[in-house]
């Protein structure tokens, strides 16, 4: 099993941080679901697709409110907060492989940070624009929004 992970929102101005993971057993699991980057979808279409994705596939969602984000950022970085959140939703699904949208200018470093937060073996691949290039991450992006 593999999963894709993405997030939406990042702090007091934007509201809560919502992190979502969507799991697939094969790439064909997404057949019939027109996933693309959630920013390109109208809200009604995004809601319809989110319902379809979460009905057909295993998913995990974590919501971190803006107060908790602000408190964490007093002593640590936003990248670490998001990496830990990515790891939490990955851990709920326990895939062998996870694709995450990189939140660091060095994508490979971000992938290592997420992997270090996991307590089970999982190959984590972090990529910039993964929400545009990997359908499973696009699906997670739709669910997160």
Model-derived features: positions:
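Acidic (Asp/Glu) carboxylate-rich active-site/surface patches
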Residues: 1-3, 7-145
């Amino acid at each position: 099993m593999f999963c894709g992970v993405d997030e939406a929102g990042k702090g007091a101005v934007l509201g809560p941080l919502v992190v979502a993971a969507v799991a697939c057993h094969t790439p064909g699991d997404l057949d019939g679901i027109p996933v693309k980057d959630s920013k390109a979808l109208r809200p009604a279409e995004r809601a319809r697709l989110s319902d379809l994705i979460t009905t057909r596939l295993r998913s995990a969602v974590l919501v971190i409110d803006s107060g908790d984000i602000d408190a964490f950022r007093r002593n640590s970085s936003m990248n670490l907060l998001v990496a830990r959140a990515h790891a939490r939703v990955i851990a709920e699904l326990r895939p062998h492989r996870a694709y995450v949208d990189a939140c660091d200018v060095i994508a490979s470093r971000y992938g290592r940070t997420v992997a270090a937060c996991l307590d089970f073996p999982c190959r984590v691949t972090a990529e910039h624009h993964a929400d545009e290039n990997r359908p499973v991450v696009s699906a997670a992006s739709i669910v997160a929004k």
